[in-house]
């Protein structure tokens, strides 16, 4: 914002002003408005009688301070709304504690209890498709990269789908306890599609980070709410 003062006018009181394209800002809208009015009064007092400030110029300068004040109020309002949204998201995130979620990842855990007759259980796995597929295949490998099972899932619609592996290898034997990897391929009419594998994780807590609320997934680290594809 600029307010011109005739620097050669002998009645110039020495009020600090800006000329040309310079700008002046206050710490907030109230300070800026006070400074603006002070300078405007000084300009009116010190204006050249042969070239007085025109009404349209005065209107323009008053409109400028109104705009700045309005923007300051708008920023305050937006800040309050943003805070309410953050609080709402924090509350939403805390409701997930203790729940299982499907997030992007390739891990399946297999385990069998020590008691007699216990069966092997596995964590769910899933896939997210942006387009429908007429052929979807899941390949499970062990920590050494050896294929232990290939699952022909078949046709799937676009969206998120969740499955459970029975923990058996191709030969029908049960896999040892441990961590396994899942790779998923999808195609439609012979054209390869993007297939995002999903892994299961248990939400153990919620923390606040620079990117917002973070879900604590234990050994899987942390993730944002945006990464959650399904709640189980």
From Swiss-Prot:
Region annotated Disordered, chain positions: 1-26
Keywords: Bacterial flagellum biogenesis
Low complexity bias: start-end ranges: 11-26
Statement: the UniProt record of this protein carries the keyword Cytoplasm: no
Keyword Cell inner membrane set for record: no
Entries under Pfam families matching the protein: FlgD (PF03963), FlgD_ig (PF13860), FLgD_tudor (PF13861)
GO biological process assignments: bacterial-type flagellum organization
Disulfide pattern: none
Family label: Belongs to the FlgD family.
Protein role: Required for flagellar hook formation. May act as a scaffolding protein.
Name of the protein: Basal-body rod modification protein FlgD
């Amino acid at each position: 914002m600029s307010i011109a003062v005739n620097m050669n006018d002998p009645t110039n009181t020495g009020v600090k002003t800006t000329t040309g394209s310079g700008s002046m800002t206050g710490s907030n809208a109230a300070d800026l408005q006070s400074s603006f009015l002070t300078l405007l009064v000084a300009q009116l007092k010190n204006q050249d009688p042969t070239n007085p400030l025109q009404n349209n110029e005065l209107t323009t300068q008053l409109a400028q301070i109104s705009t700045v004040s309005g923007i300051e109020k708008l920023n305050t309002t937006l800040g309050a709304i943003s805070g309410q949204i953050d609080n709402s998201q924090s509350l939403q995130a805390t409701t997930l504690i203790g729940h299982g979620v499907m997030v992007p990842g390739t891990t399946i855990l297999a385990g069998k209890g020590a008691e007699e007759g216990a069966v092997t259980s596995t964590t769910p796995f899933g896939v997210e498709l942006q387009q429908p597929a007429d052929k979807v295949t899941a390949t499970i490998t062990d920590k050494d990269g050896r294929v232990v099972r290939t699952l022909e899932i078949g046709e799937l619609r676009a969206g998120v789908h969740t499955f459970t592996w029975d923990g058996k290898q191709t030969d029908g034997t049960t896999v040892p306890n441990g961590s396994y990897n899942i790779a998923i391929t999808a195609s439609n009419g012979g054209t390869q599609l993007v297939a995002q594998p999903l892994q299961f994780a248990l939400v153990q807590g919620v923390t606040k980070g620079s990117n917002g609320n973070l879900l604590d997934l234990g050994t899987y680290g942390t993730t944002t709410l945006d990464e959650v594809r399904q709640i189980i």
